[in-house]
Each structure stands twice: as C-alpha cells, then as structure tokens.
Design a protein with these regions (language model features):
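TPR/TPR-like alpha-solenoid helical repeat scaffolds
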Residues: 146-152, 184-188, 225-227, 332, ...
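Structural marker of alpha-solenoid helical repeat scaffolds
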Residues: 35, 69, 103-105, 139-142, ...
C-alpha cells in the first residue's frame, strides 16, 4: 500500500513539474518519500528539481541517498559532480565525475563532459578543459549549453595564443551569446583578441562598438586608453589616452591597473609629478604587483634618484624574480653608477637567461662584456 501511495504522489509531483509549479512538486515528492524513503524515482526527481533551482546543497543530500542504495549508479554520480562543482567543491566534484565515468555503461554523455570541462577549467588545466569541451561539441552539436562552450573555448584559445580559433568561437556566438552575457560582452572579447594580435585598428573598432552601447564601460575605456598610448599605431595620441583612462577611473576609481596605465602615459609625456601620483594610487590599491614597482623604479631612474630606483627594483624582484624587464632595468641602473659594472653584467645576464630571444638584452650584454674586456 505504501509503495502505491508513494507512486501516486510521485506522479502528482511529475504533473506539478509539467505545470512549472515547483513548490507543490517538491511537496508531492516529499510525501512520496515519507511513504517510501527508498523510492529511487522520487529521490531522483526531487534531486534534479533542486539542482535545477540551484538548491545544490539539498540536491546533494538526495543524490547521496540514492547512492547509498545504488552505489554504482553512474547516472547519479554525474549530476552529483555537477552540484559539487556549482558549490566550488572541486575535490568532491572530481571524485564524483570519476565514479560516473567508471560506472556509466556509455560515458559519452555531453552533460558529463561539459561538467568535466568546467572542472578542468576551474583547476586551470586548460588543455584538458579544451579536450572535454571539444568532445561535447562532437557528441552533440546542438547541446543546450553549446554557446557557453564556444565562449569558454574562445577564452581558452586566447590563453593558448590560438587567436584565430578564439576569434572563430566569439564570432560564432556574437548574435547568440550565452546568458547572462550580451553581444557587447562578446565584442569586448573580440577586441581583446585583436589587441593580443597587435591588430590595434581592429581592436579599437571592436572596443568602440562597446562604448557606443555603454559610454561608461570602465574596462573598455581602460583598454582604449592603453591602445592610444601605443607608439606604433596610426592613432597614437597620449592626451587622448589620458582622457580615456581618466574616464575609466571616474567609472571605477578602485582599479589599480587604470592608475598604473595612467602613470605610464604621463611618463611618455615626461610629466613625472603626475606619473608619480598615478603610480602611488596604483600601489596603494595593489602593493604586490611587481610591474608597478618596476615602473616606479624607471621613474626614479629618469629623475636621477638612483637609490630610490634601486629600492623599487629590489621590491619588484622580491615579489617576482622572473621578470626579465626588471633585471634589464636594474642592469641599466648599475651601469649608470660608477664601479658597478660587474653588478650590471650580472643583472643583464639574469635578464638574458629569462628572455634569451630578446635582441636588446643580448646586444647590451655583449657590448658591456666587450667594454669590460677592453678596459682590463
């Protein structure tokens, strides 16, 4: 009798779901479970419903109750992994997906591999994430999350410097972006890819499309400011760069990167006081960024405050000893000081080890070696 009543309430729950009456559906499933706590059907229905409503903690409880009855149910391990993933519990998500792959009779399930792709992406293992997402596209080209997969692959390809493939992904979803993203968000990504390719004209055009829709888009204003700062473009203009960065800071005054880029623009104009003020604002907001301290060192070097320059370079190196630019600038500083040629050589040598293909470092190192050799 209890089994019959449980089945009856489960059917009522199914009907309520069809009518999108989620609260009553959950109530009916709970009634079903009171009459039969081991009903796989009712447990699965309520777990799936909770997961769809982003009540992942509840969903996990119900999925685990099923697995206590059917430990080898791969169809349950897969959505359990998704719930753990949505709660940022990556270790348990990884375990659940492993169990799903082991127990599913056919592991070629697009939802499963979609989740695995996101898991790898969260772990920073972008090569494995790319493989998983590509597998989903082969399994089901019309998968419900296909536009999100294209977006994620676009980001991954950009990180891998596969810029043409990245652009293909972003263009594919330009007019149908995954929610909550909009067409403007995709134009921003397209602009950023073009910028990485040093296609500055195309990057500017893409960013301006974003700005036409949202004139206070802080990140786009920041990117445009940096583009106008570039010396090797047809539209290079420091005053325009400063204007864009100032507008960006009005929209988001807490962005350390915008303050830093503003300082770089003032340096290009040799306006050292303004540059110093901007750099100070940057390090106030992010004191552990080695690039900020390197640029402060360059500023001090330009105004002949060598001791302060050394302190700034030393701080940058303590934060990250693997940036060739800092070692090169340190070498330049030592070269300017009397009786520190060997220190300069050591710094240039370290810069060369970190960036062996850089011709400027190599030329400077060779010239200093010759100069030191001839002076002996």
């Amino acid at each position: 009798m209890h089994l019959y009543i449980s089945s009856y309430y489960t059917c009522l729950g199914n009907l309520a779901e069809l009518m999108t009456d989620w609260e009553h559906a959950i109530g009916f499933y709970e009634c079903a479970l009171r009459h039969n706590p081991y009903s796989i059907n009712a447990l699965s229905c309520i777990a799936t419903l909770c997961s769809g409503r982003e009540q992942f903690g509840k969903a996990i409880e119900y999925f685990k109750r099923i697995l206590a009855i059917q430990e080898k149910n791969g169809e349950i391990w897969s959505p359990l992994g998704h719930c753990y993933l949505m709660m940022d519990n990556l270790q348990d998500a990884y375990h659940a997906y492993q169990q799903a792959l082991y127990h599913l009779p056919n592991p070629k399930n697009p939802k499963l591999w979609y989740g695995i792709g996101i898991l790898y992406d969260r772990y920073g293992s972008i090569e494995h994430a790319e493989e998983a997402f590509s597998a989903v596209m082969k399994m089901d080209p019309h998968f419900e999350k296909i536009s999100e997969i294209y977006f994620r692959l676009g980001i991954i390809y950009k990180q891998q410097q596969k810029y043409d493939m990245s652009l293909q992904c972003f263009r594919y979803i330009l007019h149908n972006p995954p929610p909550p993203l909009t067409e403007i968000d995709i134009w921003f990504q397209i602009g950023h890819v073009y910028e990485q390719q040093k296609e500055y004209e195309k990057a500017k055009d893409a960013y301006e499309r974003v700005l036409a829709d949202n004139s206070d888009h802080a990140k786009v204003l920041q990117q445009l400011g940096w583009l106008y700062h570039q010396p090797n473009t047809t539209f290079s203009n420091q005053s325009q760069a400063i204007n864009f960065l100032t507008r960006s800071l009005k929209a988001d005054g807490g962005d350390a990167q915008s303050w830093y880029l503003l300082g770089r623009c003032y340096m290009a104009e040799q306006n050292y006081n303004r540059a110093y003020e901007a750099y100070q604002q940057a390090v106030y907001r992010d004191a552990r960024n080695p690039s900020f301290w390197c640029s402060i060192g360059v500023l001090y070097y330009q105004i002949n405050q060598y001791r302060d320059a050394l302190d700034a370079y030393s701080r940058a190196i303590r934060l990250n000893p693997y940036i060739s630019e800092v070692w090169y600038d340190l070498g330049t500083l030592y070269e300017s000081c009397s009786n520190q040629t060997q220190d300069a050589l050591d710094a240039y040598q370290r810069a060369s080890e970190l960036d062996p293909s850089n011709p400027h470092i190599r030329q400077r190192l060779e010239l200093l070696c010759k100069t030191q050799g001839s002076s002996r």
